[in-house]
A protein has these predicted regions:
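OB-fold nucleic-acid-binding modules
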Residues: 1-61, 65-187
Length: 187
């Protein structure tokens, strides 16, 4: 299973994938972010140099490095990373998001996974003149919404106090606050 035996940063992991699904692919500041789910675990693969289209199914082995960024794991290329031992099968069947709550994300569930949070209340806080942090609230808890993927979520145009549904990746913790990255417009 994906990362079952690897909980700390480590180089040259021989990662075995069995029917792993590519959830989302994006390029951000020169880094290709590929999010993959196997079973109930997901991981970000950063710039491995292997073409893994969205919705593809991946099986096989690949040597990678495991690192952590603010508690969020990701895989990067090692000197031995290549796709020789991977079977990548393209698919038109889209991955289904995991239905999550704001509290689930605060509890660290669904890291690097495709999630959907329904009926959260939107709020924003100005941190410097004209610049805002955006939040999904459930009445007691809040997490940040960060439009990392080219502003696709349209978060800056949402109305404070209104209820929305968000589909995105829980892929960042910023200053101790979990962030969800929209992969499509917030509804």
């Amino acid at each position: 299973e994906l990362l079952a035996n690897n909980k700390e940063a480590k180089d040259y992991i021989n990662l075995k994938l069995t029917n792993a699904k590519v959830l989302y692919v994006n390029s951000y500041k020169g880094t290709v972010n590929t999010y993959v789910r196997e079973g109930d675990t997901a991981i970000e693969m950063r710039t491995l140099g292997i073409d893994m289209p969205v919705n593809s199914i991946i099986s096989g082995t690949v040597k990678v490095n495991l690192a952590y960024d603010a508690g969020i794991p990701y895989l990067s290329a090692s000197k031995e990373t290549n796709g020789e031992n991977l079977k990548i099968t393209e698919s038109n069947e889209a991955a289904e998001p995991v239905i999550a709550t704001v509290k689930d994300i605060l509890d660290g569930k669904y890291t690097n996974d495709l999630i959907k949070i329904k009926e959260f209340t939107f709020s924003k806080e100005e941190y410097t003149t004209g610049k805002f942090n955006y939040y999904a609230n459930d009445g007691e808890n809040k997490i940040m919404i960060y439009d990392k993927f080219s502003g696709i979520g349209g978060v800056s145009k949402l109305t404070e106090g209104e209820k929305y549904t968000l589909t995105g990746i829980f892929g960042v913790i910023f200053r101790g606050i979990p962030e969800v990255l929209p992969i499509k417009a917030v509804e």
